[in-house]
Amino acid sequence: MHSLDEPLDLKLSISKLRAAREKRERIGANARKRSVHHELMIRDDGTTVITPICSSPPPGFRYRDGDSPPFSSPPIVDLSLSPPSGTDSPSRSSLSPDRAAGDTLIDNPLLRCGGDSASSPFQFFLPLGSGLQLPPSMFMSPPKENRLSLEFTEQKQLVCQWAKCNRLFELLQELVDHVNDFHVKPEKDAGYCCHWEGCARRGRGFNARYKMLIHIRTHTNERPHCCPTCHKSFSRLENLKIHNRSHTGEKPYMCPYEGCNKRYSNSSDRFKHTRTHYVDKPYYCKMPGCQKRYTDPSSLRKHIKAHGHFISHQQRQLLKIHQPPKLPATGDSNYTNGTQLIIPNPAAIFGSQSLPIPLTPGPLDLSSLACSSVASALAGLPNPMLTLAGSPLNLAKGSLLSQAYSAAGLGLPLISLVTSGKVENEKRPKGQRGDSSERTDGSKLRPGSIEGLSLLPRGVLDLSPGVGSESLLPGWVVIPPGSVLLKPAVVN
């Protein structure tokens, strides 16, 4: 029977028609072969080029498998290669392996890099508009095990994984009908319990059949509700309604707080916004020393991810067991502007210079310094005068920061120690290593003694355990102005 694209000539025999058709096919095949027949060569530096078979190689090229050099030297199309790494960067190519033959991804075991890396194949893309093509024999199909895994995944989705069922289905609708008719309906007396293998509910039932049907869609991947605008499908009708508001711009949920006119397309977003108007922030960071609190858990997760405040399960147990004792509320210690004593671990900045700090030290109360003069208070205290978790604290001067670390680089605040008595607040240079002294009430204290406490320019208060500063590598602390009640807190 003749094809419709050929003229019907009754005077020609079938054999002549077949011979003419084969001749035209041979001519077309030869023309295409001459236009696309190229040779792959690998440069010494690992770069692969495609050049017509009649070309001569430029310097630095070698031929594979003893091929003879061609005769002429037309222009060369250079296709740079790089061995495939674990993750392909977006800058490698913007082409997709699904493109036409002119843009097809090549992954051929014959394209190998010479030397020790002969086992790693190269991948490259043919440029757009180049007109170059490669024979189909050079293209690799996915490995057999990958094809089997994909087929198994698709087939597994159409298997009823209800307990002791394992029936196979060709269509998704058949699987859905089977589950609804044979498994959901008989579960009415049992409380609509899901017995799908691996279900996270672990046998906990539903009080209504429609809830059970919605839950089953998480196992069967059924999405019966489709958006008429963008054709995106959803498993629940409520989700489709919320999605449609992104097309219509409707925002029916308004903030109930007086004076706030913000509106939202769904109630959950409005609920998150509403909590920002109230003081209650129940979600807090559990990293010791971090006092960040948030109104919703998503903001807390962003904070933990941004600052690396991850607490392991063992650390959480330690923090629960060893809670710091609370100070007794007395009338004498009325602190309205409490400030924490920040004792960070300087190992991240200063290398080996680290201060070991207990996880649960008790509050450090410097209320005994509340008098008209810090010097008189220090003179009346024994040596060592303060303790932290049973260890004596060294309040003597010490060389803490070297000249190499600038105050601007560390970002330390101004140093000032303020008691509840009458003390002058003077701006001090930011914390660096050096000598120490302090000004209070306009009287100069002699540096280098217990009375001359630690707050000269370029001085830092040393609270490392031990009487002598030589016992441990000293850490560094910063006391912001404005308080006398100081609570130790480890800072990441």
From Swiss-Prot:
Comp. bias (Low complexity): 82-97
Sequence segments annotated as region (Disordered): 49-101, 423-450
Gene Ontology CC entries for this record: cytoplasm; nuclear speck; nucleus
Region (Transcription activation): 69-129
Residue ranges with Basic and acidic residues bias: 423-444
Disulfide bond sites: none
Single GO MF annotation: DNA-binding transcription factor activity, RNA polymerase II-specific
Keyword Ribonucleoprotein found: no
Zinc finger (C2H2-type): 158-183, 192-219, 225-247, 253-277, 283-307
Compartments where found: Nucleus speckle; Cytoplasm
Pfam families noted in UniProt: zf-C2H2 (PF00096), zf-C2H2_15 (PF23561)
Biological processes annotated in GO: cell differentiation; negative regulation of DNA-templated transcription; nervous system development; positive regulation of DNA-templated transcription; regulation of transcription by RNA polymerase II
Listed InterPro entries: GLI-like (IPR043359), Znf-C2H2_ZIC1-5/GLI1-3-like (IPR056436), Znf_C2H2_sf (IPR036236), Znf_C2H2_type (IPR013087)
Protein family membership: Belongs to the GLI C2H2-type zinc-finger protein family.
Role summary: Can act either as a transcription repressor or as a transcription activator, depending on the cell context. May be involved in neuron differentiation.
Domain remarks in the Swiss-Prot or TrEMBL record: The C2H2-type zinc finger 1 has a major repressor function.
Protein name: Zinc finger protein GLIS2
Organism: Xenopus laevis
Gene: glis2
